[in-house]
């Protein structure tokens, strides 16, 4: 518990794919200080993505100092630090020197594709799915770690001698901030490694054997809300969650059936399924989320590949808008899309279709179609894809969506939010506080150290800026959605490939 009433602030460290951020919250969950620093992206080969772990730590440390200075407060006034992070990104370091043996291999990196293919050939795909809730894909940490051990000179031998440690970004930051005293991760991050059994809540010995990972290099796995240790300056480190799970908690989606959508370049949808690890029949991931006090809960996760990137395409390639914000104005100028559907399968289709050979297409063109209709169809495509995933989630878990909570850059678009409510037939809630990912980490840390009393107090702080209620008649809604599904079907299996 917090023993000093003068400790009136929580720091959330939000370590993302392109930048490190620090956000300071007061007891009312208001932002009182922020700082952000970008860091270098390294692309040594096509499909490879790396970060320098030392640069990640340096930028994250600097943002904390800068945010404190901006807020005009000292370390002594901070009750705790919460950490949220880009998930799956993999770091291996020497536990004596604290130096990485190789750059961090980023979640986007595809270098372990052949390792995944071999796992499938060896018949491990089904067990991986059942134990971890994940698909056998280079996205996740386990095959990245295997690649480092297999390809960095001396790494496997040193790991087997107990000289090297593994961690996702949360683990790396805590180890550095604690001066090498604490080697932990939380259940949400562990559930993204392809090495953690989400049912037993332990590292899976069979998977470690399959991947050839020495058990002693893995961190201890702990709940998302507890005091793990202290920084060298004496601040409690008290909350950890992967970025999407942190946003789910920041949105107070802690009961079964509650869901959030983060509208970014793509869209990340998570639905809380409570204490039930639901196995998806629709290609969704089963993952660990945070329960009411940061304990283990489960969630279904689905990703839409092209959300905000569709609007970027209108702006940068077609050049029919100058600014993403303008799309709301143009889409609202026409009463509907005039029968036009844009399926933005630029890189294939994600959940629930999983068709890498689908390609983007524009349907329903007539001489009466204007640019405004195409812009509107682009925004509508984001909402349609969200419904695709949420329908799959509801079918998988049997939970009816109570409302959809939203965050990310595109939620400022009122047209999109209203159409989202219309096509779902469900209320869409946009929070006043847009920093939901950082807020989730702050909440987890604050609950652990007694800064906030519990869920009721946090719910009181969850102010909805605007609720979008469905306004479309059921028959019209289903007619529009039927057209979308027809359009999607026409894009499937488009690119030539070997059967």
Curated annotation (Swiss-Prot):
Key enzyme in the regulation of glycerol uptake and metabolism. Catalyzes the phosphorylation of glycerol to yield sn-glycerol 3-phosphate. InterPro entries: ATPase_NBD (IPR043129), Carb_kinase_FGGY (IPR000577), Carb_kinase_FGGY_CS (IPR018483), FGGY_C (IPR018485), FGGY_N (IPR018484), Glycerol_kin (IPR005999). Sn-glycerol 3-phosphate binds at residues 17, 87-88, 139, 243. Pfam families: FGGY_C (PF02782), FGGY_N (PF00370). It is an enzyme of class 2 (transferase). ATP binds at residues 17-19, 265, 308, 312, 409. The lineage of its organism: Bacteria, Pseudomonadati, Pseudomonadota, Gammaproteobacteria, Pseudomonadales. ADP binds at residues 17, 21, 265, 308, 409, 413. One of its GO terms (cellular component) is cytosol. The gene is glpK. Glycerol binds at residues 87-88, 139, 243-244. One of its GO terms (molecular function) is glycerol kinase activity. Inhibited by fructose 1,6-bisphosphate (FBP). This is Glycerol kinase. Belongs to the FGGY kinase family.
């Amino acid at each position: 518990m917090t023993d000093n009433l003068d400790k009136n602030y929580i720091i959330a460290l939000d370590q993302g794919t392109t930048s490190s951020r620090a956000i300071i919250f007061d007891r009312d969950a208001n932002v009182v200080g922020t700082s952000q620093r970008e860091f270098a992206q390294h692309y040594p080969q096509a499909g490879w993505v790396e970060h320098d772990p030392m640069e990640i730590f340096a930028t994250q440390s600097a943002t904390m100092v800068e945010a404190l200075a901006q807020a005009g407060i000292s370390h002594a006034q901070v009750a705790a630090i919460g950490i949220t992070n880009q998930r799956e990104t993999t770091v291996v370091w020497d536990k004596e020197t604290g130096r990485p043996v190789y750059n961090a291999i980023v979640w986007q990196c595809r270098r372990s594709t052949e390792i995944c293919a071999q796992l499938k050939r060896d018949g491990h795909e089904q067990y991986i799915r059942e134990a971890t809730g994940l698909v056998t894909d280079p996205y996740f940490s386990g095959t990245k770690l295997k690649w480092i051990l297999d390809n960095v000179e001396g790494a496997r031998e040193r790991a087997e001698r107990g000289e090297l440690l593994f961690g996702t970004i949360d683990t790396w930051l805590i180890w550095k901030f604690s001066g090498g005293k604490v080697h932990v991760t939380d259940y949400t991050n562990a559930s993204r490694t392809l090495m953690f059994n989400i049912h037993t809540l332990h590292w899976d010995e069979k998977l470690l054997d399959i991947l050839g990972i020495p058990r002693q290099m893995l961190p201890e796995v702990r709940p998302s809300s507890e005091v793990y240790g202290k920084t060298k300056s004496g601040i409690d480190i008290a909350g950890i969650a992967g970025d999407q799970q942190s946003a789910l908690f920041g949105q107070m989606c802690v009961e079964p059936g509650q869901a959030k959508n983060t509208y970014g370049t793509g869209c990340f949808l998570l639905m809380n399924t409570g204490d039930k690890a639901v196995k998806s029949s629709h290609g969704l991931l089963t993952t660990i989320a945070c329960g009411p006090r940061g304990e283990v809960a489960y969630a279904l996760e689905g990703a839409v590949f092209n959300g905000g990137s569709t609007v970027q395409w209108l702006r940068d390639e077609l050049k029919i808008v100058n600014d993403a914000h303008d799309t709301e104005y143009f889409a609202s100028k026409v009463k509907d899309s005039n029968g036009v559907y844009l399926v933005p399968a630029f890189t294939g289709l994600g959940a629930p279709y999983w068709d890498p050979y689908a390609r983007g297409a524009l349907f329903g063109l007539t001489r009466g179609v204007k640019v405004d209709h195409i812009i509107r169809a682009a925004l509508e495509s984001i909402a349609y894809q969200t419904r695709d995933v949420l329908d799959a989630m509801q079918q998988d878990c049997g939970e009816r969506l109570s409302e959809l909570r939203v965050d990310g850059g595109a939620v400022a678009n009122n047209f999109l939010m209203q159409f989202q409510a219309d096509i779902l037939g469900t209320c869409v809630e946009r929070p006043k506080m847009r920093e939901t990912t950082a807020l989730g980490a702050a909440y987890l840390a604050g609950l652990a150290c007694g800064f906030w009393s519990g869920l009721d107090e946090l719910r009181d702080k969850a102010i909805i800026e605007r609720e979008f209620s469905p306004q479309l008649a059921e028959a019209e809604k289903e007619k529009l959605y039927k057209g979308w599904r027809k359009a999607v079907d026409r894009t499937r299996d488009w690119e030539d490939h070997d059967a």
